[in-house]
A protein has these predicted regions:
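Conserved hydrophobic beta-strand within the GNAT/NAT acetyltransferase core sheet
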Residues: 68, 102-106
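Short glycine/proline-centered loop/turn elements that form peptide/ligand docking sites
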Residues: 87, 109-113, 130-135
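Acyl-donor (CoA/ACP) binding surface of acyl/acetyltransferases
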Residues: 77-80, 84, 129-131, 138-140, ...
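Acetyl-CoA-dependent GNAT
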Residues: 2, 6-76, 87-89, 93, ...
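Conserved catalytic-core motifs of GNAT/GCN5-like acyltransferases
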Residues: 105, 118, 123-140
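Conserved acetyl-CoA-binding loop-helix of GNAT-fold acetyltransferases
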Residues: 79-92, 115-119
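Active-site acidic-Proline motif in GNAT/NAT acetyltransferases
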Residues: 74-76, 80, 108-110
Length: 147
């Protein structure tokens, strides 16, 4: 059984493990510390299985817009619908905090993530050219109105 809760400072190392296993250029530990401790717009959540963090999602909530900063599930735990559970929770939290729309960027090559986002009603809104610094890949910008 997976549980989702707000991320706390003591989760940073476990989140870093997920981050390093998921992205070619992972965020640094200090970035997550600042997000959790200092950024008033940041809302981060972790998903746990058997008491172990296996994924996380971050949002910035600014006025009435939510922007997904990052979402990742450890590769060993993918295929269990944890990403969908976590994303659903993040969207619900965005609505509860007054967001009326949500946006994110996703690699144009990440069709699995795009498919999941489409399940939640997100639609393409544009392309950010050369967005990803590791290989210059474009990002697909996706949006959805929240209810």
């Amino acid at each position: 059984m997976a549980t989702i809760r707000k991320m706390v400072l003591s989760d940073v190392q476990a989140v870093m493990d997920v981050e390093k296993a998921s992205f070619p250029e992972p965020w640094g530990e200090e970035t997550f510390v600042k997000e959790v401790e200092e950024n008033p717009y940041a809302h981060y959540y972790v998903i746990e299985t058997d008491g172990r963090v296996c994924g996380y999602c971050g949002l910035w909530l600014i006025i009435d817009e939510a922007h997904v900063t990052n979402i990742a599930i450890h590769p060993d735990e993918r295929g269990n619908k944890y990403g969908e559970q976590l994303f659903r929770h993040a969207c619900q939290q965005a609505v509860e905090n007054g967001a009326i729309q949500l946006s994110l960027e996703v690699r144009v090559s990440n069709t699995a993530a795009q498919h999941m986002y489409r399940k939640f009603g997100l639609v393409p809104g544009g392309i950010r050219k050369n967005y990803y610094s590791d290989n210059g890949e474009d990002a697909l910008v996706m949006w959805v109105g929240l209810k």
